[in-house]
């Protein structure tokens, strides 16, 4: 098992949450906080992905196929492609933590 060194000042709020009964121990507190953060990030990236799907009326896979098959570059679409791809990758990353 690996350990991470954490300064006392950073860990203090977690200890306080345990003292008032929000969590039973440090492991539960940290696990719950990471899980909550992952859920928030998933929601954030889901909205960004949904905005792109609404803008282009297709999902990322179809958009990727369209943009790579285009005979001429559309710089706005390529910029959106790079952003959209980053949203999809971030969504996949955070979904692994849930």
Where are these regions (language model features)?
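Short, compact, well-ordered microdomains
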Residues: 74-98
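Short, charged/polar, low-complexity loop and linker segments
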Residues: 67-71
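Small, basic N-terminal interaction modules of short regulatory proteins
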Residues: 1-66, 92, 96-98
């Amino acid at each position: 098992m690996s350990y991470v060194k954490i300064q006392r000042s950073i860990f203090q709020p977690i200890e306080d949450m345990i003292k008032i009964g929000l969590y039973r121990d440090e492991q539960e507190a940290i696990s719950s906080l990471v899980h909550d953060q992952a859920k928030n990030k998933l929601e954030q990236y889901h909205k960004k992905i949904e905005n792109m799907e609404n803008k282009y009326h297709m999902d990322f896979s179809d958009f990727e196929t369209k943009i790579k098959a285009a005979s001429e570059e559309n710089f706005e679409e390529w910029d959106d492609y790079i952003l959209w791809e980053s949203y999809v990758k971030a969504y996949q990353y955070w979904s692994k933590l849930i």
